[in-house]
């Protein structure tokens, strides 16, 4: 089974999940084996556009409930790559990512959702800079710290402590003048994320 990942407008995430579930059912696919993500990011609007997103908890809860139809799909996204592409330090990107993940867990458990189910539906999207060893350390630290954060919510299953990560090479350090240097940077970034 191939993993399918979708980025869509936040206002259409719930609808896309329904479309995907109906499509997979129509094709006779085993929904337990379908893997992927629909990246609903409640923090994108304030971070990227500078606009408030007051009803994000209700919207995230609705997306999470719709995501129950696709057990193998991650539907909540923590897009820390915005910081990487803006030139943030690795420690800043990691700190914000973990804070966002914790905020998702805290707010969604406050409205009655199960911490285990919420944690299993979160996917972290990190940016990778060309600082090879620090990026390797970032991923190791992120996995360990996320497990500690989720464990504080007393999940029913320890499998909820597992961090689901997607990495993408940085756009911040690329140059328009030398494509070959960009290839070397991207190779180093990809190796550190592997």
Identify the residue ranges that each predicted region occupies.
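Catalytic alpha/beta active-site cores
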Residues: 1-131, 153-166
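Short secondary-structure junctions and interdomain/linker hinges
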Residues: 70-73, 172, 194
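Short glycine/threonine-rich loop-to-helix capping motif typified by GTGT followed
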Residues: 88-94, 129-141, 170-184
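Conserved phosphate/anionic-ligand binding catalytic regions in large, soluble enzymes, centered on
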Residues: 181-194
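ATP-dependent phospho-/nucleotidyl transfer catalytic cores
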Residues: 144, 148
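Alpha-helix capping/termination and helix-coil
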Residues: 150-154, 191-194
């Amino acid at each position: 089974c191939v993993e399918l990942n979708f980025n869509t407008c936040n206002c259409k995430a719930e609808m896309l999940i329904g479309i995907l579930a109906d499509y997979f059912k129509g094709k006779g696919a085993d929904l337990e084996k379908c893997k992927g993500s629909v990246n609903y990011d409640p923090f994108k609007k304030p971070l990227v556009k500078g606009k408030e997103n007051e009803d994000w908890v209700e919207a995230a809860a609705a997306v999470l409930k719709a995501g129950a139809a696709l057990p193998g799909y991650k539907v909540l996204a923590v897009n820390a790559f915005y910081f990487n592409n803006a030139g943030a330090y690795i420690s800043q990107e990691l700190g914000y990512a973990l804070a966002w993940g914790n905020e998702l867990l805290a707010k969604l458990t406050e409205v009655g959702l199960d911490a285990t189910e919420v944690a299993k539906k979160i996917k972290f999207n990190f940016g990778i800079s060309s600082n090879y060893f620090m990026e390797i350390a970032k991923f190791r630290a992120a996995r360990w710290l996320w497990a500690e954060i989720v464990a504080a919510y007393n999940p029913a299953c320890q499998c909820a402590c597992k961090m689901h990560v997607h990495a993408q090479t940085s756009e911040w350090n690329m140059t328009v003048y030398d494509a070959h240097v960009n290839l070397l940077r991207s190779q180093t970034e990809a190796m550190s994320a592997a």
